[in-house]
């Protein structure tokens, strides 16, 4: 592959085929590339995942660690991959391969945290996971439902028909009653992007949607939104989701190139991201990173119309 594509995280079906991924069982052909993009400065361990979306496009997932922060703020490769699916408006994940050995020979089941995270997707029971020992030439696929028996799922909590992760949603949030006010002359524009992210946020369990927008030193912006898990602890915060976008599209930039950040979260939310977001950005972003927080409200008229 050309040198200019060494930071590529998303492949069309044709591009994937040119890399040897001509069928799902060949997903491991891209695993070394995924591992080369991982950011594991604490563990010194690079973990990669490769997944095929329902569109046929192939995505890479990597582990991301943050020196100076507690380990639970790290991003798992499977979380990275699914978040990037959401950011690219994919409708589902079909097959997934996760390397469990540094030599890229063995592939195994996602950790329990990520199996639970995968349960939030709209086609969770159809997801196939590649299992391959070092003694097998190709391995075989197993379903997520077999790898997570006696599972606790969104169906146990949410009303029937509720939109799940990777399904279209609009949280009907607004910063004020006026679009003109949102985009007035003092608007940083990141505020609008963070609001749009919050409107995509998957937070059906606490109803605390939030979104983050980041800007780097060259003016390029990135965004992500809070993704909840029915099991709570596997949830992914909005800063981490925005950092998935940053890692996937910044072409190798360090987090210290992030110079501006905006968090939009629901007013009086049961789960607030403000303090955690500030802690993360204070630790990894540029020393002078400008961090702003805006509180949004549900537009009841819009919500009534959409329902």
Swiss-Prot record:
Tagged with keyword Nucleotidyltransferase: no
Q: Which residues bind substrate?
A: 63-65
Question: Where is Zn(2+) annotated to bind?
Answer: 76, 111, 114
Q: Does the keyword Metal-binding apply?
A: yes
Enumerate the PROSITE patterns for this protein. CYT_DCMP_DEAMINASES_2
Q: How is the cofactor bound?
A: Binds 1 zinc ion per subunit.
Q: Mind listing the UniProt keywords for this protein, alphabetically?
A: Hydrolase, Metal-binding, Zinc
Task: Give the top-rank taxon of the lineage listed in the UniProt record for this protein.
Answer: Eukaryota
Q: What is its EC number?
A: 3.5.4.5
Family matches, as CDD domains: cytidine_deaminase
Tell me the ranges covered by the CMP/dCMP-type deaminase domain, including all copies.
22-155, 185-307
Any idea which GO molecular function terms this record carries?
A: cytidine deaminase activity; zinc ion binding
Q: Where is the active site?
A: 78
Q: Which InterPro entries match?
A: CMP_dCMP_dom, Cyd/dCyd_deaminase_Zn-bd, Cyt/Deoxycyt_deaminase, Cyt_deam_dimer, Cytidine_deaminase-like
Q: What are the BP-aspect GO terms?
A: cytidine deamination
Necessary cofactors: Zn(2+)
The catalytic activity, as recorded, is:
cytidine + H2O + H(+) = uridine + NH4(+); 2'-deoxycytidine + H2O + H(+) = 2'-deoxyuridine + NH4(+)
Which family does the similarity line name?
Belongs to the cytidine and deoxycytidylate deaminase family.
Question: Assembly and partners?
Answer: Homodimer.
Task of the protein = This enzyme scavenges exogenous and endogenous cytidine and 2'-deoxycytidine for UMP synthesis.
Q: What is this protein called?
A: Cytidine deaminase 7
What species does this protein belong to?
Answer: Arabidopsis thaliana
Q: Which gene encodes it?
A: CDA7
